């Protein structure tokens, strides 16, 4: 805590997660195309960030999380693989659970269309 002019300021201590983007748009892709996309994030907090679980709203989307804690100031990524053999619109949610004090649960979105 810091005191200035009689006011008390406290800074939250702990891991914080900040994603570059909460949505990835595949755009128009062809059946069988590469379905892997990346969500990049940074631990902007003061303690190690642990991604506890990442899951998808559908079995057609397979997320992959970091296996080790992410130190303060470090960057990492959540990899998402969509089954592009499924023709039609892509509208899926990937949920990330972590020990982040600012957002312990985050919903990521993928959109697009497989032709």
Q: How should each PLM-predicted stretch be described?
A:
Residues 1-13:
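Bacterial Sec-dependent N-terminal signal peptides
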Residues 10-40, 115:
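Beta-sheet-dominated interaction scaffolds and their linkers
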Residues 24, 74-80:
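Short strand-edge motifs at loop-to-beta-strand transitions and within beta-strands
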Residues 31-38, 85-93:
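Short, solvent-exposed loop/turn segments enriched in Ser/Thr/Gly
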Residues 41-45:
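Asparagine-centered strand-capping/turn motif at beta-strand->loop junctions
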Residues 47-54, 106-108:
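Short, hydrophobic/aromatic beta-strand segments
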Residues 57-64:
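Short, solvent-exposed loop/linker segments at beta-strand-coil boundaries, enriched for Pro/Gly
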Residues 87-115:
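Terminal connector regions
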């Amino acid at each position: 805590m810091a005191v200035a002019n009689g006011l008390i300021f406290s800074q939250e201590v702990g891991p914080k997660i900040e994603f570059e983007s909460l949505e990835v748009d595949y755009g128009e892709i062809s059946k069988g195309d590469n379905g892997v996309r990346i969500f990049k994030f940074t631990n902007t907090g003061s303690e190690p960030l642990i991604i506890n679980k990442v899951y998808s709203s559908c079995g057609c989307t397979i997320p992959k999380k970091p296996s080790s804690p992410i130190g303060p100031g470090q960057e990492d990524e959540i990899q998402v693989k969509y089954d592009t053999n499924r023709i039609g619109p892509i509208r899926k949610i990937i949920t990330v659970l972590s020990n982040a004090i600012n957002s312990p649960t985050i919903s990521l979105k993928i959109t697009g269309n497989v032709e």
